[in-house]
Design a protein with these regions (language model features):
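A positional/structural detector of protein chain ends, strongest at the extreme C-terminus
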Residues: 1-4, 385-389
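Beta-strand-rich domains and repeat architectures in extracellular enzymes and scaffolds
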Residues: 37-62
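Repetitive beta-architecture junctions, highlighting loop-to-beta-strand starts
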Residues: 15, 62, 73, 96, ...
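Structured C-terminal portions of repeat-based eukaryotic scaffold domains
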Residues: 198-329, 334, 343-356
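WD40/WD-repeat beta-propeller blade N-cap
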Residues: 35-43, 78-85, 121-127, 162-169, ...
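A short helix->beta-strand "capping" segment at the edge of beta-propeller domains
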Residues: 4-42, 71, 304-312
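WD40 beta-propeller repeat blades
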Residues: 87-268
Length: 389
């Protein structure tokens, strides 16, 4: 992200409307009065497919979309689950392989070239998070209190860890460079680091981190991805070393700190780690759809320090749910509760000048709608809550 900021900063390049409002009682007219409170399909999650071939979106209408990273054009769409899709995972090796988990108590593995799922794993509990590791052979799922493991090749359950958490497991993530190690994070405020090659839970537990508040988002950072950041439901940020279980810093008032420095912040979205500059950036948002990128101090000298890096506004009209940053093209993608997918790029680059390929995706058409007052589906106002969900 530092590279993009130094080359002129990130600006809105394109906007795609993922879904349009369904007509009610035969009314097919566009909604003109955008002050009304309409129900919109949220973009809940976004993940890049292998070889940067596209972007997979999980929508609140229980569908998955595949879109072009260059144009945001719609490539493929299918109905995935019978309840909320909580996460989507994409294979790092095959652009056609992805997995989804849902509150309908199952995980589905997909080959997007086929109409039906390649495999359905009946977990039997609401699945809040999933990750696949160990050479894409082991599926880890986060459910109520249990981390459950399955063989991706057969769908058979291999085991579970159920003693380390006392509340719902909100995130499971295999380590990016040590694929036999998995992190679990929970609403109980605890983050655990396991060697999942070991079936006994006590023996498998490498470290345990007490974040002290319900964990909503985690991610790895550092040259060897030896550290982890944790965002919580009370809008705090924790930085830890996974291997030593050392707390690097606890940002207890980071939302207030942003507001006190004229950075309007209602919630914390996610963090982006820049491998090239070894910097961690926090993306914080407000209910109007604006974002600020804040550089987070991670070493001893800079711990506790915050530095405003960029303001991103004009793309969204409601809370932002998910982000993906492509370091190769210095491009940021954001999805929100306004059913919009936005692309932010350095002005003048190839990524910023890519043309839209269908009627769903166009920066110019989006600007035209704002000018005329017409907005397809009348964007729903963000809920006035401390979290966007």
């Amino acid at each position: 992200m530092r590279g993009g900021l130094e080359r002129g900063g990130l600006a809105l390049a394109q906007t795609a409307v993922a879904t349009f409002a369904q007509p009610q009682q035969g009314d097919t007219s566009l909604v003109v009065n955008t002050t009304e409170d309409f129900d919109y399909d949220y973009i809940l999650d976004c993940q890049p497919t292998a070889h940067k071939s596209g972007l997979a979106l999980a929508l609140s209408n229980r569908k998955v979309q595949l879109r072009s990273l260059d144009t945001l054009g719609l490539v493929h769409e299918f109905h995935a689950h019978n309840s909320t899709i909580n996460e989507v995972w994409t294979s790092p090796s095959s652009p056609y392989q992805l997995a989804t988990c849902s509150s309908d108590e199952c995980v589905k593995l997909w080959d997007t070239r086929a109409a039906l799922p390649a495999m359905v794993v009946p977990v039997g509990r609401e699945v809040w998070s999933l990750s696949i590791g160990c050479g894409e052979t082991l599926l880890a799922t986060g459910t109520n209190e249990l981390a459950m493991f399955y063989d991706v090749r057969t769908g058979n359950k291999l085991g579970e860890y159920g003693e380390s958490h006392i509340d719902a497991i909100t995130k499971v993530r295999f380590h990016p460079t040590q694929p036999a190690f998995v992190v679990t994070a929970s609403e109980d405020g605890v983050v655990c680091f396991f060697d999942c090659r070991i079936p006994d839970e006590d023996d498998a537990l490498e470290s345990i981190l007490n974040v002290e508040s319900a964990v909503t988002t985690i991610g790895f950072f550092g040259p060897q991805k030896e550290n982890i950041f944790c965002l919580t439901g009370t809008e705090t940020l924790d930085l830890w070393n996974l291997w030593t279980a050392e707390r690097l810093h606890h940002y207890a008032t980071i939302r207030d700190d942003c507001n006190n420095n004229s950075l309007p912040t209602d919630y914390l979205i996610n963090c982006v780690y820049d491998d090239n500059s070894n910097e961690l950036f926090l993306l914080a948002g407000n209910h109007d759809g604006d974002m600020n990128a804040v550089n987070i101090g991670t070493d001893t000298a800079s711990a506790g320090k915050l530095q405003h890096a960029a303001t991103l506004k004009g793309g969204h009209k409601a809370a932002i749910r998910c982000i993906y940053y492509d370091p190769e093209t210095t491009t940021l993608y954001t999805g929100g509760e306004d059913t919009r997918l936005c692309k932010w790029a350095v002005p003048g680059t190839a990524s910023a000048s890519a043309e839209a390929s269908d009627g769903y995706s166009s920066a110019s058409s989006s600007n035209s709608r704002r000018t005329t007052g017409l907005d397809p589906a009348g964007i729903r106002k963000a809920r006035k809550a401390s979290r966007p969900y």
